[in-house]
Amino acid sequence: MTSRGNHGSKTSSDKHLGDSDFVVVANRLPVDQVRLPDGTAIWKRSPGGLVTALEPLLRQRRGAWVGWPGVINDNVDLDLTIKSIVQDGLTLYPVRLNTHDVAEYYEGFSNATLWPLYHDVIVKPIYHCEWWERYVDVNRRFAETTSRTAAYGGTVWVQDYQLQLVPKMLRIMRPDLTIGFFLHIPFPPVELFMQIPWRTEIIEGLLGADLVGFHLTSGAQNFLFLSRHLLGANTSRGLVGVRSRFGEVQLKSHTVQVGAFPISIDSKEIDQATRDRNVRRRAREIRAELGNPRKILLGVDRLDYTKGIDVRLRAFAELLAEGRAKRDDTVLVQLATPSRERVESYKILRNDIERQVGHINGEYGEVGHPVVHYLHRPIPRDELIAFYVASDVMLVTPLRDGMNLVAKEYVACRNDLGGALVLSEFTGAAAELRQAYLVNPHDLEGVKDTIEAALNQLAEEARRRMRSLRRQVLAHDVDRWARSFLDALAEAPARDAT
């Protein structure tokens, strides 16, 4: 990634600027606060594909990361005073949030308004003016912290739906910066997006960037249409390609590029971890602990209503009832990571899923031999990889998902060319993983038929499918995703910095 050249002359206010040439802006910092037995608070690095992909660039280019550290802070004055956290050589700048910020900006507008709307209104979005006002206020704080962090002429990469207003705000504060934005969740169809009372403000916010990126070409096309419809902007009319043939929005002052950049995983690292003898041994132990069944079905998800956990449970129960899956030699393991536990719809979902699991085990299980094994807690990385290796069929059945990296992780783990991937058509991953067993999660009979086919696939068919899937996942990793976006951002049309 290279600089796009002269951004204009510096001003007398440059003494207030930061010294970071490359700044990542995300809702969360890549750290968690941990309390030691003596009560001391320390910061511990949290795992994640995004920081893994960007860490080399952050180190090479005097990089910094702006985000919320995950700690609710009602005692500190929420001014613009920046105190950095240095963790493993990375410089992190916290944006402090208080109880009201978390309730209204994060749990409210981000996750009870935008999240359900962008995921096809599986749950009805809630619109509150107070939530919107808090969203604007918190986005402004992120922009102000970033403005004070970035060096003159630097590059800023804003991440995801919680921060859609930051590009425009930052553009006004710092016209010298090169700004990119990437949306990690689906961008909705036009008719759904138009429901948002603040639809124009969101599109204007995103258009503060030089490059706006989505997982899929459909999201890019929807965004181009909305830019024409809501703002009267001139836009390109041709189809947007994947990492190519970018769309353009031509505004009075500048041109914004729009593209599709499917995100991925650190597939080579996962493939290597799978080969560890301890992971292999743990995979064998998992099968033994489950009673050495003939087939293990696996689901791995955040506990979220978009993930279709109830669909796979219902399909599995009916397969057992119809004798198409045998209760004495087939088990389903569902690993559900806790998520947004203070949001009401998530509380209801957890109760529903756990009731469903109990009903299936009560109907088809035996004492000491449940047919569904359900864990509602975070799973350590090596343990998760062992589950991937141990399982025979991976069930990825979201009703809507921007990409779904679990599907790619499973494929990266299967260097034995075993296993089968059942994958929802409504994930971004389905556009790339065409040799999976693709399924419509809204068609229960189709889900059942597909799971049955995956359970009974022949070994040669399994190898053929998995070999093709692995070629795709290993070649298109998270490093390629990040570099393709940042290369395109570096080549975007330059703006006048004045």
Swiss-Prot record:
GO biological process terms held by the UniProt record: trehalose biosynthetic process
Keyword entries, A-Z: Glycosyltransferase, Transferase
InterPro entries membership: Glyco_trans_20
Domain of life: Bacteria
Pfam families, A to Z: Glyco_transf_20
Pathway: Glycan biosynthesis; trehalose biosynthesis
Membrane-spanning ranges: none
Binding locations of D-glucose 6-phosphate: R28, Y106, D160, R340
UniProt-listed Enzyme Commission number(s): 2.4.1.15, 2.4.1.347
Record's keyword annotation contains Transcription regulation: no
Transferase is among the record's keywords: yes
UniProt similarity note: Belongs to the glycosyltransferase 20 family.
Quaternary structure and interacting proteins, as annotated: Homotetramer.
Summary of the function given for this chain in its UniProt record: Probably involved in the osmoprotection via the biosynthesis of trehalose and in the production of glycogen and alpha-glucan via the TreS-Pep2 branch involved in the biosynthesis of maltose-1-phosphate (M1P). Catalyzes the transfer of glucose from UDP-glucose (UDP-Glc) to D-glucose 6-phosphate (Glc-6-P) to form trehalose-6-phosphate. Probably also able to use ADP-Glc, CDP-Glc, GDP-Glc and TDP-Glc as glucosyl donors.
Name recorded for this polypeptide: Trehalose-6-phosphate synthase
Organism whose genome encodes this protein: Mycobacterium leprae (strain TN)
Lineage of source species: Bacteria, Bacillati, Actinomycetota, Actinomycetes, Mycobacteriales
